[in-house]
Amino acid sequence: MTSPLCWAAATTTVTSPEQAPAPSSKAKGSKVHRSKSMGRAQAWPAHHPKSATSFHAMKSSVHAQVLELQRKIQLLEGDRKAFYESSQWNMKKNQDTINQLQEETKALHVQLKDLLQGDSKVIQAIIQEWKSEKPFLKNRTCEQALEHLEHQLREKMNQLNALRHQVILRQKRLEDLRLQHSLRQLEMAEVQDSNMEAAKTMRNLENRLEKARMKAEEAEHITNVYLQLKSYLQEESLNLESRLDSMEAEVMNTKHEVQELKVVNQEAINARDIAKNQLQYLEESAIRDRKKREHYITDCKKRAEEKKLQTERMERKTHRDHVLLQSEDTIQDHQRHREEELRQRWSMYQMEVMFGKVKDATGVAESHAVVRRFLAQDETFTQLENLKKDNELALAKLKEEKQRLQRELENLKYSGDATLVSQRRLHEEMQKTFKKEEQRHNDVHERLEHTSRILQLVKDCLEHLANKLSHVKLDDTVLAGKKLDRDSEDYAYNLLVVVQEKLLKLQDQLESQDVPELLRHIADREFLATLEGKLPLYNTRILLPVASVKDKFFDEEESEDDDRDVVTRAAFKLRSQKLIEARSKKRNRLRRS
């Protein structure tokens, strides 16, 4: 270092001659100090070694003092930075403490303000909670507001006590009314016990009348349902056969089209496979040709590299000999003679190498035989030239044929792809059409099954109704004495006609009868039947002679048998539900198979 402090320390320090010179890299790097020391060394005479030793010792001591001063300066700088950081941290801590104390002071000021304004705060809080008391508490103190609120509280307590007293009085009144109601109920029970027989008779009559009305309404409803079914079946029977025939024809046509499309699809797949095989064969042949060419090229390159290496070796050898010859500058004549000899040797060596190659190529050891062989090779050379030209022409033709086949392959590839795409699109369209037709066929099949179920249900209902009306005889109709065939197609229609005529005949017979009297007679019989059903098993019933004439339309035994044979609505629904479930299970099994 070249600071004035260092130079002053160097001038004031006394060095001892026994210290060994140990200059550091920093002291050696000082330009000014080096120049002065060099100047002094040059100025001193060469026969004073002790003065040079003292100079080096002084130089090393100065350098040690400089390092010590630098170390002290670094320590002072570190102390200064630590003191600065600690002071900054203390300032930050004091600032945080000041901010906290300011916030606490603000909070204490707010509390003091609230304490000074306590009455107004309390009144404002009361006004916000009870806005209805605002005009009474607006300009009052806290004590006045509390007195006012206590007064209102006392009034509300008085009102509450008055309401409680009214509630107690009304509860007592309610208990009295309940007691009176229980007494009235006991009186009504006594009156009802006295009139129980008449009330029971009235209830039984009302029940029988209601049952008769319900049966009449049910019969009307069944008649309307059968008429609707008859009209619906007549309409369906007109169009069902033609629609089924047309649907079957459409299904057959669709199947034929699907078979044709399958054949076309198989042909397209076969053509695609053939094209793929041809393309693969051409690609493999092209790869083999390319590999052959690459192998031939690599062989040629290897031979060329070998020739090149041989020539380089020969050139290096000649160059080395030439350099050795040129290094002998003293013997020029010998050099010329040496050069001529080397040229001759080199020419002889080249001739030997060439002759060896010719011998290797021709397989002849003598020179005159080699000459004869070369003369005989003229005709062979001409033949080889002709063969080369022919091979070049054949190669050109083969290249043209290859290009033509490549173009045909590209055309076939693109045309085959286009044909395949069109065939796929056509196949997808036909698949969609087939799915639509199959869906329509399934819908028609479901409708047919539904219609057949309805027809079977109608047949069962008509047979049941015909069995009920078997006592009604038809005289002036075509189907009166004719027995209906159950397996015939017109069985349901003929049975419906018979049932309709019987119902019309019954309706005509009922018009001439007294309907209220018949209903009363039915109700009496039902009442007696219910009484008999309630009797215990050990009770013996004594039949009294009946003076009234039996009605031919309401035989008791016949009506009981009919009631046993009548299918209720719940049983009818259960039977139809079982039939639908069986059909659906059968359809699911067919679809899965």
UniProtKB/Swiss-Prot annotation:
Keyword line: Cell projection, Cilium, Cilium biogenesis/degradation, Coiled coil, Cytoplasm, Cytoskeleton
GO CC annotation terms, alphabetical: axoneme; centriole; ciliary basal body; cilium; extracellular region; outer dynein arm docking complex; sperm flagellum
Name of the molecule in the record: Outer dynein arm-docking complex subunit 3
Region (Disordered) residue spans: 10-50
Compartment(s) where it occurs, according to its Swiss-Prot or TrEMBL record: Cytoplasm, Cytoskeleton, Cilium axoneme; Cytoplasm, Cytoskeleton, Cilium basal body; Cytoplasm, Cytoskeleton, Microtubule organizing center, Centrosome, Centriole
GO terms of biological process kind: brain development; cell morphogenesis; cerebrospinal fluid circulation; cilium movement; cilium organization; determination of heart left/right asymmetry; determination of left/right symmetry; epithelial cilium movement involved in determination of left/right asymmetry
Organism: Mus musculus
InterPro entries reported in the protein's UniProt record: ODAD1_CC, ODAD3
Described function: Component of the outer dynein arm-docking complex (ODA-DC) that mediates outer dynein arms (ODA) binding onto the doublet microtubule. Involved in mediating assembly of both ODAs and their axonemal docking complex onto ciliary microtubules. May be required for motile cilia function.
Lineage start: Eukaryota, Metazoa, Chordata, Craniata, Vertebrata
Coiled-coil segments on the chain, per record: 84-317, 378-449
Pfam families, per database record: ODAD1_CC
